Amino acid sequence: MKPAMETAAEENTEQSQERKGCFECCIKCLGGVPYASLVATILCFSGVALFCGCGHVALAGTVAILEQHFSTNTSDHALLSEVIQLMQYVIYGIASFFFLYGIILLAEGFYTTSAVKELHGEFKTTACGRCISGMFVFLTYVLGVAWLGVFGFSAVPVFMFYNIWSTCEVIKSPQSNGTSGVEQICVDVRQYGIIPWNAFPGKICGSALENICNTNEFYMSYHLFIVACAGAGATVIALLIYMMATTYNYAVLKFKSREDCCPKF
């Protein structure tokens, strides 16, 4: 029989080796996490959620403001109402698509990172896998350009509401020349092209305009459009990160498929 001290030493050695094995396994697993894609996914989900949620509510508030104050005749803004309703349905589609696309890109990031870092033995990748990675690179570039347009488009209602808000601030300022001067300060939304020129009243002046700025619909819509624009900007940044990650991984996969080499992302 072995002495008790020798048996205890062997048990301690085995336990330390097990702990070391678990630690190395954890480090290896963490090494396979595509951190760039993970950050981009979180940023993409947050940006799309802000853009879609805030944009949907802000559009509904905009319609309410137009109907109550700038275009009392329903037929004058019927086309605008249909367009806004269509945009709200498009928002549902955008949210669903990017939720799925973000998950797919994250999964693709895990696949390419594991392949590049050779976590599961020697480097292995197929022509189909490289083709799929290339497809994601192209699609992400297209979506990035498209979201740049969405970001610019989302700034338009912010600009419009800012003009109305700044006009109201001028009306509230003590420099306004009495009641007659205030009533000459107006906002005409027809100049933005969202309602036709024959819409009535189309133009609001003075104290009536100030009352619009004090409504909850105006306050909420203005700030929600700002948040929606910020969400669109966050989505653009997320897609830029996706572009860099997918392009780098695809390039390394192509390179390592010809000659086993080192880098990783």
UniProtKB/Swiss-Prot annotation:
Glycans are attached at residues 73, 177. Pfam families: Myelin_PLP. Keywords: Cell membrane, Developmental protein, Differentiation, Glycoprotein, Membrane, Neurogenesis, Osteogenesis, Phosphoprotein, Protein transport, Transmembrane, Transmembrane helix, Transport. Highly expressed in the ventral medullary surface, moderately in the cerebral cortex and cerebellum, poorly in lung and kidney, and not at all in heart, skeletal muscle, liver, stomach or stomach. The modification Phosphoserine is found at residue 257. It comes from the Eukaryota. The keyword Membrane applies. Induction: By hypercapnic stimulation (CO2 inhalation) in ventral medullary surface neurons but not in the cerebral cortex. GO terms for cellular component: membrane raft; myelin sheath; plasma membrane. GO terms for molecular function: structural constituent of myelin sheath. GO terms for biological process: axon development; central nervous system myelination; extracellular matrix assembly; negative regulation of protein localization to cell surface; negative regulation of serotonin uptake; ossification; positive regulation of bone mineralization; protein transport. It is found in: Membrane; Cell membrane. InterPro entries: Myelin_PLP (IPR001614), Myelin_PLP_CS (IPR018237). The chain crosses the membrane at residues 31-51, 90-110, 136-156, 224-244. It is a multi-pass membrane protein. Its main location: membrane. Belongs to the myelin proteolipid protein family. Interacts with SERT. May be involved in neural development. Involved in regulation of osteoblast function and bone formation. Involved in matrix vesicle release by osteoblasts; this function seems to involve maintenance of the actin cytoskeleton. May be involved in cellular trafficking of SERT and thereby in regulation of serotonin uptake. This is Neuronal membrane glycoprotein M6-b.
